[in-house]
Amino acid sequence: MQKVGISAIVTAYERVDQTLKTLRILESCDPKPDEILVHVDGNGIECVDAIARTYPQVRVLVSNDRVGPGGGRNKLLAAASHEFVASFDDDSYPIDSDYFARVLQLFDRFQDTSIISASLYHAGEAISLDEREARWTADFSGGACVFRRAAFIAAGGYVPLPVAYGMEESDLALRLHAQGGKILSSSWLRVFHDTDLKRHAEPQVTAGSIANLALLAYLRYPVSLWSIGILQCANRVLWLLRHGRHRGIWRGLTMIPGHLRAHRHFRLTVSNRAVRSYLALRRAPAHASL
């Protein structure tokens, strides 16, 4: 079997059958990753046992308390044996069987890349052709990307949050950007996310998405740019109202003070210039020549 020098990591929480499906697809890739590691959140013993029975070669890490997908990925990347670490959710997996060979080609072509983000498709969405195109972007999807392990560790990893919407990837991407790291997004890498995203309408997700935007601004923006964070929170609330996601809005707003206090030890701001250039790249990604 061809060795590719890639670790694959999966963050799992409660969805046992979907976790096993993701592992089956990873194992069927050609070439497949050199190792697969799974983090099981919230002491999910049923999931741990199912993996041990079906895929005994997979390394399993367990957290007794909920640390969220970001906290799980922190542990997985610390334990990974290889420099390139392909990251998936328990319900996301490669569409193309040669996914990992393509990953190596992209890292070889773009050797200054910190993260490569795949095109992510959800249930019910049309899947586009795997065109050999790429661009430099501000953001990435944690369940459909490949990390350069050294860059991830140098940036400090994720802030562990049980409900991380609106915070975890943006926060890490901003810190990477401030350090000169680069994120490449490519349509040549395709990942399927086996969900219809209905859970995004749950009240706790709505609340978390508001409070996390405030947390991002508090942890990373200089005080002179806190007005941008306030505007981002306001825009999020307006978007939620327009889309009928009313439940959780008030909770999200009222939890902000406590949310900031609870995570104040993570505060490490980046420069005014870094925030502005990051937001500019988010608005206008740059073409990368393949």
Where are these regions (language model features)?
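Short, acidic, metal-binding catalytic loop of nucleotide-sugar glycosyltransferases
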Residues: R24-P33
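Short beta-strand/loop segment that forms part of the nucleotide-sugar
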Residues: P33-N43, L61-S63
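A conserved acidic beta->alpha catalytic loop
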Residues: V40-V48, S92-Y93
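Glycine-rich, basic loop-to-helix element that forms the pyrophosphate-binding segment
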Residues: S63-A80
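Short aromatic/hydrophobic "clamp" motif used to bind/position activated sugar donors
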Residues: V85
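Conserved donor NDP-sugar-binding/catalytic core segment of glycosyltransferases
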Residues: Y93-D130
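A short, conserved alpha-helix in the catalytic core of glycosyltransferases
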Residues: C145, A151-G156, P162-R190
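Non-catalytic, C-terminal membrane-associated alpha-helical segments of glycosyltransferases
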Residues: G208, V223-L290
